[in-house]
Amino acid sequence: MHKHVATNLKKKPKMPFTFSHPAIILPLKNIFGKWVSLTGLIIGSLTPDFEYFLRMKIQSDYSHTIIGTLWFNLPLGILLCFIFHDIIKKPLIENSPNFIQSRMKELKSLNWKEYFMKNWITVSLSVVIGAYSHIFWDSFTHSHSFFTNFFELNRKIEGTDIPIFKILQHLSTVIGGIIIIRYFLKQKTEIIDYSEQNIKYWINIIILTISILTVRIYLGLRITEYGNIIVSGIASGMIALTFVSLYEQRKTGGNTVYN
């Protein structure tokens, strides 16, 4: 089983949209409470696709494997947790619309370093669980993966050239996105002192994203490589988000609450 999952995810790179993957693990926080880390679960569920983003092309040799999760996804996932909480979180929330800010008070005030020092085992296990949930989901939506073969999902829908797994791939992306949006909207709103959004924050992110993607194309990425264009665009956006947020933190002096 492990070999099938790992091998075929490398050969067939098309996948459900990365940011729909947390949908499958959100219920675990309600079930297990303090015994799991929501940050760890969410970032863990995204981490396997970060090999694509790091390479800026759809190639995964390690992150979609059972063993690779332990030596690749786990340390990368923990690093991403720190990048999000210590660099991205505060400026991102403060420059988001009010309906987002009002639901993010608890997240914004979380002292991640303190939480991690006390709960590093919980965070680590949550990252691993999240990563395995990603691989499990993908095993239903990739050609010739274990569950695709087991349930014969490679069969084409009658009268079309579309295999069943491809329908599951796109359908699960939409359903996952809806679940995540609904989960967010159900979060309690709190009365807060809203931060005034700085449009320059978003303009800088857009400009830097386009600049990075342009360099990537100049270095040999063909416009017709649609999948690679998409992952390169996402990677460029995340790099831009990180550096612009870091600049905002340095410019304003940061806030000790979020250290």
Segments and roles (model prediction):
Residues 2-259:
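N-terminal membrane-targeting hydrophobic helices
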